[in-house]
Amino acid sequence: CGVRPYGWLSRYFHTDHTRRLLIEAGFDYHMDDYSGDVPFWDRTTVPERPLVIVPYQLDNNDMKMWTDPAMGPEQWLAYAKRNFDQVYREGVEGNPKMMSLGLHLRIIGRPGRIWALEEFFRHVRAHNGVWVTTRHEIARHFARVQPA
């Protein structure tokens, strides 16, 4: 039967009412924020029921290979690795961040591109202390370590 959704991404179709509706529906987190790479609390929409915001990073999205002909798997991989290296360095220096990848089977999952994702994960696994997880787990972890 599956699992109910715990988070929500409207892409560009959210309104001023989206977060309130998500809170009323019992969602744990919202992703329609493109402002950074650290989760935070929305304590203003419904002050008595804060909502975790897990930012979405459009620049790491594999959709770039679909919409920008100049962004092939080589360029996507180079960008993703540079992004990871910077975020990792900031974490080692005591300022941990998250990096998200928006991935689509119809794009990165194609035979001519999947190698780039495999190479990216080889690069990530070569670094100590990296947590590869879901956005739901990030939201749950954030709520535990930074209670509202």
Regions found by a protein language model. Give the residues of each.
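A broad detector of the eukaryotic-type serine/threonine protein kinase catalytic domain
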Residues: 2-6, 103-106
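C-terminal domain-boundary segment and adjacent tail
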Residues: 29, 81-148
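Active-site-adjacent pocket scaffolds in enzyme catalytic domains
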Residues: 3-95
